[in-house]
């Protein structure tokens, strides 16, 4: 219901406005006060000895940050860097922090997005709610550039480049602060970032257009790859920030979807509930982020659809040129 108020101008907003408006004002006041405390030095803000790139957003929910992080990490690896990725591990609880993600890490300990980033890139990934501690650990392990998955509002960590990802279709909704609207910070915050990446929809002036390009469906058990439109009677589910985006992609690919089920972002799946859902079709299709949580109890007819961020060559060059400039300021070199 809350997203209908934020993005769809639902009539119930008139009933909830008197309650949510003062809470939104309070949220804004607290956020401004905390940010100001870091800016004037009243609160400590960690400056790393290597470049830090923050990939975040100014709205609550998923906008496509993780594909951007993966794209950045892969490009940096191609250029000879040893990138380290920082995440707070949303929804997870590690036995110890900072936690360095590896092939044996449970998503309940590290989070689904950190595990996905590790599996896709093989990069160093560290999880800690206190992000500077994760950065320090990654530097100890040999990272020479940091990419943070989310953390735009985590001012305890200084950064050199800020990248904001925007949902190109939903944009900023009613443009109100949480909880009245989806904003973590006012839209004026965008004036101070290095890049605004628009995921789908129409990029506004000065923004970088990104599309998420789907690959072939991958079997969770065997790794076999097939075109998604060759799979019959699909049960599709997604536990991401905006599940309809995934279902729309399947529709555009001509997939034979008989059931679609959305779940909350970062939700832990009950194996029995997912198995019951799966019985409604011949095959199951899910997002790659969901696959890292489902692999331990997957069946032979379960598939996931990987997607990759894609930019124009001009925009790629813009982003990489800015990174090169920052690296030179540090006097760093590739690995």
UniProtKB/Swiss-Prot annotation:
GO terms for biological process: lipid A biosynthetic process; lipopolysaccharide core region biosynthetic process. ATP binds at residues 59-66. Keywords: ATP-binding, Kinase, Lipid A biosynthesis, Lipid biosynthesis, Lipid metabolism, Nucleotide-binding, Transferase. It catalyses: a lipid A disaccharide + ATP = a lipid IVA + ADP + H(+). Pathway: Glycolipid biosynthesis; lipid IV(A) biosynthesis; lipid IV(A) from (3R)-3-hydroxytetradecanoyl-[acyl-carrier-protein] and UDP-N-acetyl-alpha-D-glucosamine: step 6/6. InterPro entries: LpxK, P-loop_NTPase. Belongs to the LpxK family. This is Tetraacyldisaccharide 4'-kinase. It comes from the Bacteria. The keyword Methyltransferase does not apply. One of its GO terms (molecular function) is ATP binding. It comes from Vibrio vulnificus (strain YJ016). It holds the Pfam family LpxK. Signal peptide: none annotated. Transfers the gamma-phosphate of ATP to the 4'-position of a tetraacyldisaccharide 1-phosphate intermediate (termed DS-1-P) to form tetraacyldisaccharide 1,4'-bis-phosphate (lipid IVA). It is an enzyme of class 2 (transferase). Its EC number is 2.7.1.130. GO terms for cellular component: plasma membrane.
């Amino acid at each position: 219901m809350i997203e209908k108020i934020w993005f769809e101008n639902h009539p119930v907003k008139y009933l909830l406005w008197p309650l949510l408006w003062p809470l939104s004002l309070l949220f804004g006041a607290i956020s401004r006060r905390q940010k100001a405390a870091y800016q004037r030095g009243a609160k400590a803000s960690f400056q790393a000895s290597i470049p830090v790139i923050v990939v975040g957003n100014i709205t609550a929910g998923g906008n496509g940050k993780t594909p951007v992080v993966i794209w950045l990490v892969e490009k940096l690896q191609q250029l000879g860097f040893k990138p380290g990725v920082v995440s707070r591990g949303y929804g997870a609880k590690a036995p110890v922090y900072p936690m360095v993600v590896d092939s044996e890490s449970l998503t309940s300990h590290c989070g689904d997005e950190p595990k996905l980033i590790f599996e896709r890139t093989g990069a160093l990934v560290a999880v800690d709610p206190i992000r500077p501690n994760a950065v320090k650990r990654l530097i100890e392990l040999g990272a020479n550039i940091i990419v943070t998955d989310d953390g735009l509002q985590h001012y305890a960590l200084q950064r050199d480049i800020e990248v904001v990802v925007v949902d190109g279709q939903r944009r900023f909704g009613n443009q109100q602060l949480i909880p009245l609207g989806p904003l973590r910070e006012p839209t004026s915050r965008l004036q101070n970032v290095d890049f605004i990446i628009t995921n789908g929809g129409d990029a506004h002036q000065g923004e970088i257009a990104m599309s998420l390009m789907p690959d072939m469906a991958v079997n969770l058990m065997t790794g076999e790859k097939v075109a998604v439109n060759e799979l019959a009677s699909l049960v599709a589910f997604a536990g991401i920030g905006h599940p309809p985006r995934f279902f729309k992609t399947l529709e555009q690919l001509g997939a034979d979807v008989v059931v679609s089920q959305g779940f909350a972002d970062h939700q832990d799946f009950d194996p029995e509930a997912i198995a019951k859902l799966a019985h409604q079709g011949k095959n199951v299709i899910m997002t790659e982020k969901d696959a890292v949580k489902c692999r331990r109890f997957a069946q032979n007819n379960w598939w996931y659809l990987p997607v990759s961020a894609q930019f124009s060559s001009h925009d790629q060059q813009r982003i990489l040129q800015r990174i090169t400039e920052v690296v030179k300021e540090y006097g760093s070199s590739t690995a």
